[in-house]
Amino acid sequence: MSQILEKILSEKALEVSSLKKNNSLSNLEKIGHGFKRRGFEKILFNFRTQKKLAVIAEIKKASPSKGQFKTDFDVEEISISYESNGAACISVLTDKKFFMGSLENLALARNKVQLPVLRKDFIIDPIQVAESFAIGSDCILL
């Protein structure tokens, strides 16, 4: 395993531990039921039946290998641009330490557009799946 991946997984284990101390799986699931899901699978199926390329556009501020991509980073503006230019879905990086993402970025994107929103993070525990559900993710990338 690469050194950076080991660091990321170690950090995720700490985050999961903190998440479990402050939340229960059942409470996060209950919160998640308050969101109307936007049909990630249905959107992709519709693009396919129309013989159109379905683009999942990514909101990503930084990466461990490239650093920060952009200093003026407006999640709402990016989301609107992706939707108006025909994206099928929006993927939002939520890893804070290594990709400068956040759960708040996912919420901002979700509140600004009607597209399904995917949470992209290093998901290593079922409580993170429940957390994703609780913040309004329509799907996750494992």
What spans do the regions from the language model cover?
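Conserved phosphate-coordination/catalytic loops
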Residues: 34, 69-73, 100, 123
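Arg/Lys-rich RNA-binding interfaces used to dock onto structured RNA substrates
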Residues: 56-64, 73, 91-94, 103
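Surface-exposed amphipathic alpha-helices with a cationic face
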Residues: 45-49, 83, 106-111, 133
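Active-site-adjacent beta->alpha loops and helix N-cap segments on the catalytic face
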Residues: 94-113, 122-130
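Hydrophobic faces of well-ordered beta-strands that scaffold small-molecule active sites
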Residues: 55-59, 90-92, 117-120, 140-142
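Alpha/beta enzyme core
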Residues: 67-93, 112, 126-139
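An N-cap/entry alpha-helix motif that binds or orients negatively charged groups
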Residues: 2-70
